[in-house]
Structure formats: structure tokens, C-alpha cells
Amino acid sequence: MDSTNQNLFASLSKKGPVRKENQDFSVVTFNRFGQLMSLVCDGLGGYKGGKMASALVSEVFTKSFTVFDFHSQTERAVKQWFEITLIEARRTLEQYFQTIKRNQVQFARMATTLVLSIISKQNIWTFWVGDSRAYLINSYQSLQITEDHNLYNQLLQMHATPDVIASYKDKLLALTATVSKDQERQLKYSFRCDVVNAWDFLLLCSDGLYNFLDPNCFYEVITSAPNLKKAVTQLAKLSLDNASNDNITLNLINLKQWH
């Protein structure tokens, strides 16, 4: 599945070679105020219901984005919008589970990652939960602007010693935050704001892409392609050539075309 809007954005999501289904979900859309949202969700493949979780969470955020004007909003107001929508997403997952639990009790742990960026005027507001990523790209660098919510990074934040980190060697990539139906758990997400005019491209992607590509290649691959659609196709192909075994999803925004 892919979508494009001329020279502004391109999106691609495809099933990995050893996956039974594509549990990723992506959206690139405008709201009624002319602002743009790019979103990627990666449903947890280890649990039943990952595909439905990513689709439902994407739907909730898309609906909420459509009616909210981000222009001239304070950081606090934008964060409040995200928190309210995240709570609604949790509630939606719980409601869905209640309708099917009699026959699908294994859906109890359905969950997804989430990364989204909203572009309004010259601001790029980025939120994330889990390990789907966002990169800002220009000719000088590909800057990862998200930090994976996993055990390794949590241990680093706790200033754990190398020996302690090594003791968790088989669990370091375990996620420490996801979007699930667990409404009792404290909200955990991260946020940052960047400016459009310092960058050429914004890339959001799932780990099926970034785990198998060197980010330093992003700019050359994108700018060597004749258009954005070919660029996302080439990035996906390169990750497969490098033995990606996961679902691959990416949204690419041409910030030079943003006015």
C-alpha cells in the first residue's frame, strides 16, 4: 500500500517477507486548517490484535487531528491535545476488546507503537510512544529526533553500570512504552518541537526500515530518486536487500515544498 501527494509527501507500507500480516499502519493527511499530520503505528507482533491496535489508534488520532487548529498554540496546549487523544485511543482499544473478548481473549494485550509529526506554519511537533522513529534530513545529516522507549535507553537514563546493562543483554530492546488498552498505567510519551526551514525532509518509519539501513544514506537515496514515490520505494527495497524480516512502513515529507 502506498500513497502520494505530488511533490509534498509519499507513503509506503508493506508486509515483511516472513510476516503473516502487515501490522503497521500509516497516515499522512491534512486537517481543515491546512496543517499536515504524518503518523506511523507498528502493532506489536508478539501479541494478537496488533493489526487492529495500530489501525484503531491511527483512526482516533486522525479524527482528533482533523478538528484541532495547531496554529499559534502553546506547547502546553499541543501536549494537552496529545494526552487527551492518547487517553481516547486507550479507551477505544478497551471498548474494542470488550466487544470481542468472549471469542478472542488473546487480544487482551493488543498494543502498538506510535510516532506522529504535525506541521503547522514553521513548527514540527513530534510525539512518540515506543520505538517507531522520526528523522529530520538535510545534506549535512540525518538526525534521529525520537529516542526509542526501550529497556536499553531506560537503563542509560538511570545511569546503570555496564555490568548491569550486560545482565539484561537479551531484553535490551524490550519496549518500555506502548499504546494499549491499559488505562490504569501512567501516560508515557515523549515530545519535541523543531522548525521546518532548517531541514529538507521529514521521515517517519517503523523498525522494519531503520534497523536495516544506515541513516547516513537517506539523503542520497531520496535526492537521487526522480520523485518521492520512487524514493520511498527505493528505501524499502534497500532495507529488504539488507535482509529486513519485518513489516516496512515509512512516510516521507518534502519540507522544501511546505509553505
Swiss-Prot record:
Residues 8-255 form the PPM-type phosphatase domain. Gene3D superfamilies: PPM-type phosphatase domain. InterPro entries: PP2C, PPM-type-like_dom_sf, PPM-type_phosphatase-like_dom. The keyword Acyltransferase does not apply. It catalyses: O-phospho-L-seryl-[protein] + H2O = L-seryl-[protein] + phosphate; O-phospho-L-threonyl-[protein] + H2O = L-threonyl-[protein] + phosphate. Keywords: Hydrolase, Protein phosphatase. It is an enzyme of class 3 (hydrolase). Its EC number is 3.1.3.16. GO terms for molecular function: protein serine/threonine phosphatase activity. It holds the Pfam family PP2C_2. The keyword Protease does not apply. PANTHER family: PROTEIN PHOSPHATASE. This is Putative protein phosphatase. It comes from Mycoplasma pneumoniae (strain ATCC 29342 / M129 / Subtype 1) (Mycoplasmoides pneumoniae).
